[in-house]
């Protein structure tokens, strides 16, 4: 049976929970599309997050790796297109590290593109009645760090797809951030299940507009 590795993060930035792990942990040992899903939590720490991720990939030999992170303020499920080779932290990570303009991988490419069928995933999530879009930036904090490091590792591995999805706050978090959008955990879970199945069985992405003007 094929394996899908899905990851979420521990809380950071003063939050008591991280919606990515709250939802991703529910998928551990699930069977989706005939494949076993394994969930792992990543520390919100530069360097350490990639060490944990790389160890999980080496141990599990997954067919798909989907990293998930919190994007407070976003209104929908956002499937990331690209990760860039820079750490530029506006706030410290959970170990107090705050790199500024430091490469994720020294001498690595300027960017890596997701190898997931991102537009097909967005389309399938929308068809499930859940708001979703392609995102053009994963930021420059630990989420981008993980996405870049993941894709850099997978570039030397045959037949393994990988990428990143950002999700909004959960309602209980938004209650502490008046005006902030949120999405229920059950809805996020359905979106991630849909994304996983699409990633498993769509090899060539669909050609539809998913860009941004700014």
Curated annotation (Swiss-Prot):
<keyword id="KW-0378">Hydrolase</keyword>
<dbReference type="InterPro" id="IPR036440">
    <property type="entry name" value="Peptidase_C15-like_sf"/>
</dbReference>
<feature type="active site">
    <location>
        <position position="166"/>
    </location>
</feature>
<dbReference type="Pfam" id="PF01470">
    <property type="entry name" value="Peptidase_C15"/>
</dbReference>
<feature type="active site">
    <location>
        <position position="143"/>
    </location>
</feature>
<dbReference type="InterPro" id="IPR000816">
    <property type="entry name" value="Peptidase_C15"/>
</dbReference>
<dbReference type="GO" id="GO:0006508">
    <property type="term" value="P:proteolysis"/>
</dbReference>
<dbReference type="GO" id="GO:0016920">
    <property type="term" value="F:pyroglutamyl-peptidase activity"/>
</dbReference>
<keyword id="KW-0645">Protease</keyword>
<keyword id="KW-0963">Cytoplasm</keyword>
<keyword id="KW-0788">Thiol protease</keyword>
<feature type="active site">
    <location>
        <position position="80"/>
    </location>
</feature>
<dbReference type="InterPro" id="IPR033694">
    <property type="entry name" value="PGPEP1_Cys_AS"/>
</dbReference>
<dbReference type="InterPro" id="IPR016125">
    <property type="entry name" value="Peptidase_C15-like"/>
</dbReference>
<comment type="function">
    <text>Removes 5-oxoproline from various penultimate amino acid residues except L-proline.</text>
</comment>
<dbReference type="InterPro" id="IPR029762">
    <property type="entry name" value="PGP-I_bact-type"/>
</dbReference>
<protein>
    <recommendedName>
        <fullName>Pyrrolidone-carboxylate peptidase</fullName>
        <ecNumber>3.4.19.3</ecNumber>
    </recommendedName>
</protein>
<dbReference type="GO" id="GO:0005829">
    <property type="term" value="C:cytosol"/>
</dbReference>
<comment type="subunit">
    <text>Homotetramer.</text>
</comment>
<comment type="similarity">
    <text>Belongs to the peptidase C15 family.</text>
</comment>
<dbReference type="InterPro" id="IPR033693">
    <property type="entry name" value="PGPEP1_Glu_AS"/>
</dbReference>
